[in-house]
Amino acid sequence: MEIKDKNNKTQFFVTSTRKRNYTNLIKSAQRLKNEKFNFEIIVIGRNKVFNISSVPKDIKDIFIFKGQVTYSKLYEIIENSDYIIITLTPESKYDNLFRKTRVTGSAQLSYGFLKPCIIDREFAYFYNFNDKNSLIYNDLNLYNAMKKAILLNNNEYNNLRNNILLITKKIYSISIMNIQKLIPEIKHYNFSNAPPNLLENHPLIY
């Protein structure tokens, strides 16, 4: 994958997901706009969760809500974005599952497209994110992380992306080793009893 420079107008990507709190994102965006920073936030996902009516009138112009989209459209949007904001918060019991037993799809998009994440420090370690490959914040101080993301020059930005590439290679190697360990078991699995593909004949949406 080609490592390209940042957009002149910084593009943040975020998902509209059940049980997430977007108050901190809205407050941070409002403060950044008041300080005349050049950016916009692309939102993908269920409009009933987080939509244009959730955003104060004076910052509606920087939020672009796409709703649910096909995977091909999602990948196009990610490719054109600069950063992925992961809105997990340690105060949420539901979100805490995403640093123990569950994996957020936004982290996987970061790995796949080499896009630096903006993520709370409480969750960063679980996903191998750190200050060398992403923008880490704590105490709900999302504003500082977004501001730093906007101000990064192209060399600093591309260094983050190159370091994400190191993570993806590490994860790939571990995955291959795990698959190799399972191969003997897979050989004896009866796939005729596997359930049908439930997504067959249905459009893939995110």
Regions picked out by a protein language model, each given a short descriptive name:
Residues Q68-S72, T104, D139-L140:
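Structural motif corresponding to alpha-helix initiation and N-cap regions
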Residues T70-Y83, K93, G112:
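Short acidic alpha-helix that forms the nucleotide-activated donor recognition element
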Residues P116, Y125-N138:
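A short acidic/histidine/glycine-rich donor-binding loop in glycosyltransferase catalytic cores
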